[in-house]
Amino acid sequence: MTKPAVVLIGGDKGGVGKTTVARTLLDYFAHQQLRVRAFDTEVPRGTLKRFHPDVTDVVDINHVPDQMRIFDTVNSTDATVTLIDVRAGLLSPTLHALRNIGFIEAAKKGDITFVLFHILGPSIASLDEIVDTAAYLGDAKYFMVKNFINNTYFFEWDEATTAAYFKRIPGAVGITIPKLVEMAAEQVDLASVPFATFIANKKQSGASASYSFVLRGYVRHWLDTIWAEYDRVGLTDIIEARESPRPPIGRPRPIIKIAET
């Protein structure tokens, strides 16, 4: 039986493209035919919900009833994947809350697959975020994402820097999100549809649209590049991990040898 998976997308800095990454993931999971539900913590407007209204609910991640709404239903929902788009500044508090409620421990025991996409900013301060995040991870699958939004220039990590920070998370894997042509990004934003829907020249309702052939081509190439990154790191295999068979409860029953006749 496939374990429920929780995918967290966050970063403590704003303007690093967390929701853009979340949108590419929702399209990717749909393409892989994985049932997914999403929670948008950008209260009250809900940016992710604007693009994926059918699978997304807006919640206040600091509000205990909303935490219950997400995590109490992880095992009972029909969705294989629960995706959470964490608003800027709330990644560390959210991880702290997950540790306090026992979620991190449940992931460590193998009851839940926990995946974290940590969207890094371009400054050296992001390295401190990595250190802070490492304290909460447990056995989570940790992806460090460089999102080249707005021609962002990322600092280069030399060997000493890598040794000092990255060794704290031995299983960390890097993912690169390229920049989408600005006009294409603007048109998808104006259309308020998923990237895959824009590529298919459809409106949110499913009706045919008249988006630019050129811009759809740019979005298709960009999204294919990102999906290739997700394939490279084996994201689908991670999400579809199965529960380990549990040992029998109690002592094994004795084997009774039947006498030969």
Which functions belong to the PLM regions below?
Residues 1, 125, 137, 210, ...:
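Catalytic cores of phosphodiester-bond-cleaving enzymes
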Residues 2-8, 22, 31-97, 101:
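Nucleotide-state-sensitive switch-loop elements of NTP-binding domains
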Residues 7-10, 116-117:
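Short glycine-rich or small-residue beta-strand-to-loop segments that form or flank ligand, phosphate
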Residues 14-15:
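Walker A (P-loop) phosphate-binding loop of P-loop NTPases
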Residues 18:
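Conserved lysine of the Walker
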Residues 89-189:
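Conserved catalytic-core segment of NTP-binding enzymes
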Residues 143-261:
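C-terminal accessory "lid"/substrate-recognition subdomains
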